[in-house]
């Protein structure tokens, strides 16, 4: 799985970007509107959390500004009748937090505000996901730290790992 792509932003549209890595590989990544709004200018460095979908006819990368958005996307894919395009559409219409809250609170009206989600689909989302979002914690703001105070993280590349305590 390709969990993250970082490099120079060479192209951006409302629904997709292209990132050229330092190794010279360019990745086309499908994104929700919320991710587009936080992108840097063309030519600047960008980093996206990604989810790879392998189909018979294509390999598609979906990218998100935060790991939280990616986790919500992955959970929504587990609902009956929801594919990557609809899940991405949900995150383009609602923030990840609002989507999770709507499902937990069984808010049919909010869910039906998403294009291609009618009453039956909203009910199915609630049925399939209401009890499966309990461990999905919010860290949607770029740079947010969901870990407990004092947690450690590893920074640096291969052979250059540096451990530090979180403030």
Predicted regions and their residues:
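Glycine- and Gly-Pro-enriched alpha-helical subdomains that act as flexible
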Residues: 112-115, 125
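Amphipathic, charged-and-aliphatic alpha-helical interface segments
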Residues: 52, 59-64, 84-103, 124-137
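Strongly charged, low-complexity linkers/loops
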Residues: 125-167
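A general alpha-helix detector
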Residues: 71-72, 86, 106-110, 150-158
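A short amphipathic alpha-helix within small helical-bundle interaction modules
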Residues: 76, 91, 99-104, 111-112, ...
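A positional/architectural concept
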Residues: 1-78
């Amino acid at each position: 799985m390709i969990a993250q792509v970082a490099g120079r932003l060479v192209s951006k549209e409302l629904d997709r970007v292209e990132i050229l890595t330092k190794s010279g590989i360019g990745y086309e990544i499908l994104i929700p509107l919320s991710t587009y709004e936080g992108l840097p200018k063309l030519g600047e460095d960008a980093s996206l959390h990604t989810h790879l979908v392998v189909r018979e006819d294509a390999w598609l990368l979906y990218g998100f500004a935060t790991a939280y958005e990616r986790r919500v996307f992955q959970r929504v894919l587990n609902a009956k009748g929801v594919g990557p395009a609809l899940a991405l559409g949900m995150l383009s219409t609602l923030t990840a937090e609002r989507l999770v809250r709507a499902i937990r609170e069984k808010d049919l009206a909010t869910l039906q505000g998403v294009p291609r989600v009618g009453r039956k689909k909203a009910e199915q989302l609630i049925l399939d996901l209401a009890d499966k979002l309990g461990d999905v914690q919010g860290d949607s703001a770029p740079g947010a730290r969901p870990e407990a105070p004092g947690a450690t993280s590893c920074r640096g590349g291969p052979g250059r790992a540096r451990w530090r305590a979180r403030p």
